[in-house]
Amino acid sequence: MGVVEEAHNVKVIGSGEATIVLGHGFGTDQSVWKHLVPHLVDDYRVVLYDNMGAGTTNPDYFDFDRYSNLEGYSFDLIAILEDLKIESCIFVGHSVSAMIGVLASLNRPDLFSKIVMISASPRYVNDVDYQGGFEQEDLNQLFEAIRSNYKAWCLGFAPLAVGGDMDSIAVQEFSRTLFNMRPDIALSVGQTIFQSDMRQILPFVTVPCHILQSVKDLAVPVVVSEYLHANLGCESVVEVIPSDGHLPQLSSPDSVIPVILRHIRNDIAM
């Protein structure tokens, strides 16, 4: 195993001609895909990895400058694909990884046959004629809460993000992976994600995008998915799923996994 693969805990499982690469969002790691993977391994080669900064990665490898914007993560993704000699893949990106996949596809469109985006947003802060879901003051308070008492913030944020109470297995799972992050890294990653603005790159995307969205999501209003659909330069399709929360593949697998599989298996009908 190479340095890049080891640093990102890369796992390759399953068998099939087509390759699926699964990218996780903030506060999670590759375990967030545990309900989806069993449905893929018989038909696809499946690549799992952890974004740098996840609690499962070595915090000494986290370069605060490199990961102060999403481009650093997109270069990591390209490096993983190149190391594995993947010529083309279906990329399934949750939350920030959806936008990381989009960024990577701008540099290397040949590596991606389609991008399946789950709970994706190009910008989280409201703007003129744009509803991102947060005011800047909301985010300032969020960052201060992370800074002042990370564990307390995790316990409060997890049920809101997942859509459930602390008795929920999905909330407990997200709390675990969120709390695994080193607090200073979590703050840095959170600031990078929530302050990002990817709207300007959307018209230049050429790889087809399948946009999947919970009907109720604390972090991403449904109008954001419609914005992506309207502004992406590529072929795109939106499906709003009757699920609650920002991590539907973890919290509502019975209703969400079949939808993800359908978008993996079927291309956009023109």
Curated annotation (Swiss-Prot):
Changing residue 246 to A: Threefold decreased affinity for karrikin. Disruption phenotype: Increased seed dormancy. Long hypocotyl phenotype under red, far-red, and blue light. In young seedlings, expressed in hypocotyls and roots. In adult plants, expressed in rosette leaves, stigma, sepals and silique peduncles and tips. Changing residue 194 to A: Fivefold decreased affinity for karrikin. Pfam families: Abhydrolase_6 (PF12697). Involved in seed germination and seedling development. Essential for plant responses to karrikins, a class of butenolide compounds, structurally similar to strigolactones, released from burning vegetation that stimulate seed germination and enhance seedling photomorphogenesis. KAI2 is not required for strigolactone-mediated responses, but MAX2 is necessary for responses to karrikins and strigolactones. Lacks detectable hydrolase activity against karrikin. Karrikin binding induces a conformational change. This is Probable esterase KAI2. It comes from Arabidopsis thaliana.
